[in-house]
Each structure stands twice: as structure tokens, then as C-alpha cells.
């Protein structure tokens, strides 16, 4: 089944009944009731292998339908919802954490992951090393006690690209699982499990929801690495609201048309940006000048609405701030993946690569507005800082 068809037909409840609603039922429940003790015990046993009703904190049928849809889209064995994307990443890290374990994390990883490492993992005795953003130095950084490689590709500021099949081949030769933050592609433009990745993490907050009104994360995992993932949310008290699950299900029905619209608009905006002398570098993976562009085009079905610019020499951070403040249709906000356009002055948080002497940078999320309006808005803002 094509991904476009999966988005419409998967995760819609029991399709074998004679009469049903087009959407799955929204089930809110903290307590699940059983007809007798034997039934209660039966479902407590079933939940070890299946997603069944057993306890509200472990999810309701609404949650399960969303998990089925995302799992089908990503081609995984199982999926597990979390209240935020960061919580999902934290669970992946905790699942492999132990005293004297060694983790490799790529430099473009979502910045708060570094805080998890500092506040929790290092105190537990986990050793952390950061790879180059493209993971090109992975082989030389692997140690006998390396238990996990966590990457993000493309990165969410400069869109660094990793050769995932190559990375996975190296990692698996050392029996090391590979996890990826796949939020950029959101299971639609890239299917990392097909390329050898073991665990895919998506912030459903962004494109899966698509309407900037939900926070949620999801872990999609292959059968080999599933192990205790289903126990982690309940053990640590993580649960996901069925109302939020319902909203993400609704958002995902239009994921295909939204992603294509974001990409088309981003293409048009990038074409305009290439005419501006105020810009030194445009970071957009579809550009032939983008590092590892060929790998991106080989593995991805498209690009999302993310574009970053680096201003030319002579422009200061203050100029970048004035530029962003002059924008009318680009709001200032830290997230992305919704229907609206955003612009933020940013600095790539890196340790393996030094970007401190580069910039200033502005990251855009190209929303679903008319691109003629967006281009006119950008032109006006550029003119306000013209040298």
C-alpha cells in the first residue's frame, strides 16, 4: 500500500463491523473495567505482546489506532506514544543506559538532548561522545562499550545529511543499534528503518499534527530492539492524552498534501533567496550546493518547509534581529511543522564542529501562506537592512 493510501485507510478502527464512523472513536479512560477476574488476568497477559485495553495510562483504543498508523507509515514492528518528542528521545536513551555504557550522538541532535546527557546520563555513568553532524567519523569513535548511536538527519538547523545505510552497516558490524530523530521527514519523506536504522523517533508535535496545537512524540522500532519499550512509559508515568492522539490522527489524514505544499513553497522561497545579495549561504538539502546533496536525493522523497540562511559578511546579529522583527507573515517561534511561517535568529549548538565564527543565521519554516505574500514580506525585511 502506498504511503498516501496508508494515511487515509490505516488507523481507522475495526473495519469489519457492519456500521461504523469514518473516524475512530475518541476513548477517554483512566480506568478499564473487566467482566471478571479471569478476563482481567487475560488482558494483563495479552498486554505483554499486544496493544490491548488494560490500564488507562497504557493507552486507549484511540492511542492504539494512531500507533498503528504511524507504525505502518514507518514500516516498524511496534510504535509507542509519548507526551513530547523529547520524552520519546529520552526513553530511547534510558533504554540503553547503564553504568560504563558509551553513547555516540551526532552533533546536530535536538539541543535539549545535551541537557538529558548532562543532568541524567552522565550521572548514571554513561559516557557520551559527539560525532560530526554527518557521522563521517563514526568508525574512529566506536568503543568496545558503545551501546547506542543516536543521530538526526537532516539536522533541524543546518540540515546535515547522514549516509544512513553506511552508518548502519558500520554500527551493526559492532552489534550497536542505531536510532534516528526522523522529525524532519516525519515518516513521509524518509523511511529510515528500510535503510537499516533500528529506531525512529518523531516529534508528532510538528508535521504529523500539522496544526501547532499538540505536543507528542513517538518511537517506532523494529522487532529486535522492541524489548522493554512498552514498559517504559508506565514505569516512568508517561502517558499520552487520547484527545491529543485524536488530533494527530486527524492531522495525519492530510499529511501528504501538506508536506507537498510545504516543499513547493520552500522551493519557491529558496529560488527568491538566491537573488538576494544579503545572503552568503542558503541551507536547503535540495540545492546541489548543499553538503551530501546526492545522498539526500538518493534516500529522501522530498524536503520539508525548513530553510536556513547565513547572512553575508558585514551583517551583524543585530541586523538579523532587525530583519526578523520587520517580517509580517513570519512569526517568531521556536517550533515548526505547523501551518504557519516562522523565522528565528539562531546559532547552531555544536561541540564536534565550530560554527561560532559563522553567521548570523536565520531559520525559516515556510508555512502554507501564498508564496507571493511571503516573498514580498521577505523583500521588505531585506530592504530594511540593506547596506
Labelled PLM ranges:
Residues 267-328, 334-337, 347-356:
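Conserved small-domain helix->loop->beta segment predominantly found in fold-type I
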Residues 36-87, 113-119:
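Conserved N-terminal alpha-helix of the aminotransferase class I/II PLP-enzyme fold
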Residues 11-14, 28-35, 206, 254, ...:
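Glycine-rich beta-alpha junction loops
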Residues 248-257, 305-313, 362-367:
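Short, well-ordered beta-strand elements within core beta-sheets of diverse protein domains
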Residues 50-52, 214-216, 302-306, 359-363:
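Short, solvent-exposed beta-strand edge segments and adjacent coil->beta transition regions
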Residues 7-15, 78-278, 283:
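Conserved PLP-enzyme active-site core in the AAT-like
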Residues 1-27:
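Short conserved active-site loop signatures built around small residues
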Residues 118-119, 127-129, 315, 326, ...:
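PLP-dependent enzyme catalytic core of the Aspartate aminotransferase-like
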